């Protein structure tokens, strides 16, 4: 059985694709850390209600990348989703 270069490379490509898909299906995804949701362990570590340390945590800015004609990194914070380009120029978030 002789394989031409095209057949051999296509078989290798299919095998690599199958390996990648199977490993992606097996690995667990930590959605809590990915989306900024507190896990059960973090919730138990919070102080008791009425404690001196029971204050709301500081707001952290959410950084995200938008791909269009150019890849740009934005920082979003606030209730209304004000968005600022990371290198200083403001860019209002349009919905």
UniProtKB/Swiss-Prot annotation:
Q: Does the keyword Secreted apply?
A: yes
Keywords, alphabetical:
Amidation, Cleavage on pair of basic residues, Neuropeptide, Repeat, Secreted, Signal
- Name which cysteines form disulfide bonds: none
Where it sits in the cell: the answer is: Secreted
List Phenylalanine amide occurrences by residue. Answer: 67, 77, 87
Query: Which residues does the propeptide include?
Result: 25-58, 90-95
Segment forming the signal sequence: 1-24
What does the entry give for GO biological process?
A: cellular response to carbon dioxide; negative regulation of nematode pharyngeal pumping; negative regulation of striated muscle contraction; neuropeptide signaling pathway
Domain of life, per UniProt, equals Eukaryota
Question: Per the record, what is one GO cellular component?
Answer: extracellular region
- UniProt keyword annotation of Cytoplasm present: no
- Could you tell me what this protein does? FMRFamides and FMRFamide-like peptides are neuropeptides. AQTFVRF-amide inhibits the activity of dissected pharyngeal myogenic muscle system.
Query: What family is this protein classified in?
Result: Belongs to the FARP (FMRFamide related peptide) family.
Q: What is this protein called?
A: FMRFamide-like neuropeptides 16
Taxonomic lineage of the native organism: Eukaryota, Metazoa, Ecdysozoa, Nematoda, Chromadorea
Encoding gene per record: flp-16
């Amino acid at each position: 059985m002789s394989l031409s270069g095209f057949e051999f490379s296509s078989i290798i490509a299919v095998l690599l694709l199958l390996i990648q898909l199977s490993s992606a299906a097996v690995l667990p995804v930590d959605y809590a850390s990915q989306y900024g949701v507190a896990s059960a362990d973090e919730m138990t570590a919070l102080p008791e209600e009425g404690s001196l340390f029971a204050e709301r945590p500081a707001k952290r800015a959410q950084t995200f990348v938008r791909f269009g004609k150019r890849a740009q990194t934005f920082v979003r914070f606030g209730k209304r989703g004000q968005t600022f380009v990371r290198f200083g120029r403001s860019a209002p978030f349009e919905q």
